[in-house]
UniProtKB/Swiss-Prot annotation:
Organism: Rhodospirillum rubrum (strain ATCC 11170 / ATH 1.1.1 / DSM 467 / LMG 4362 / NCIMB 8255 / S1)
Principal EC category: hydrolase
Binding site for dCTP: 109-114, 127, 135-137, 170, 177, 181
Pathway: Pyrimidine metabolism; dUMP biosynthesis; dUMP from dCTP (dUTP route): step 1/2
EC number: 3.5.4.13
Assembly and oligomerization: Homotrimer.
HAMAP family membership: dCTP_deaminase
Protein name (Swiss-Prot/TrEMBL): dCTP deaminase
Taxon lineage: Bacteria, Pseudomonadati, Pseudomonadota, Alphaproteobacteria, Rhodospirillales
Length: 195
């Protein structure tokens, strides 16, 4: 069952859902909360490799992915430019904490999509028990460069109450790849390949 604005306010007041910094009333929609763009990005550095092997036996190594991506910090009153056909990772300003009986769903804003910006390419579900800032997967599928500025409203998170708490809350898992993230982290696909 999706949570309404009334439910979201109640869950936040009870401390069941935490968003830090706390959103203003103008950020709470009928069934979602707007999140803002942070100042940290990761971009692929061209020319490092000819391709990325996603599966064994050639499988990608974690340190190899780190080497493929550069880290970009955007200062106050500056913009991050995403050119047509480019992909980048970004992060929300807000840290989000969910209980074991609530999942989140992240969606881009329609107004930005109409300009060619995909805000979250895949993996829209935020697992129950999540605690951290949220990495965004940007792609510019439009014809013009897009200037994104820290602090702008970039996406919305909605919440769904589970019928019962999960036995595997994300932050409690010793193998959770992205728990407590505070910056956009590159893929940790390599940690999947032992399974």
């Amino acid at each position: 069952m999706k949570l309404s604005d009334t439910d979201i306010r109640r869950y936040m007041a009870e401390g069941r859902i935490a968003i830090d910094p706390v959103p203003g009333e103008d950020a709470i929609g009928a069934m979602s909360v707007d999140l803002q763009l942070g100042d940290s990005f990761r971009v692929f550095v061209p020319g490092k490799v000819s391709h990325v092997d996603l599966a064994p036996p050639g499988g990608i190594k974690g340190r190899d992915i780190e080497a493929l991506m550069g880290h970009v910090e955007v200062g106050e009153n500056e913009a991050f430019y995403l050119h047509p056909g480019e992909f980048a990772l970004g992060i929300t300003i807000q840290r989000v904490r969910l209980p074991a009986d609530v999942a989140g769903r992240l969606d881009g804003r329609s107004s930005l999509a109409r300009l060619g910006l995909m805000v979250h390419a895949t993996a829209h579900t935020i697992d129950p028990g999540w605690d951290g800032r949220i990495t965004l997967e940007f792609f510019n599928c439009g014809p013009l460069p897009l200037a994104m500025r820290p602090g702008m409203r970039i996406c919305a998170i909605s919440f769904e109450a589970l019928m019962s708490p999960t036995s595997k809350p994300y932050a409690a898992s010793p193998t959770a790849k992205y728990k407590d993230q505070l910056a956009p982290l590159p893929s940790r696909l390599a940690s999947d390949q032992s399974a």
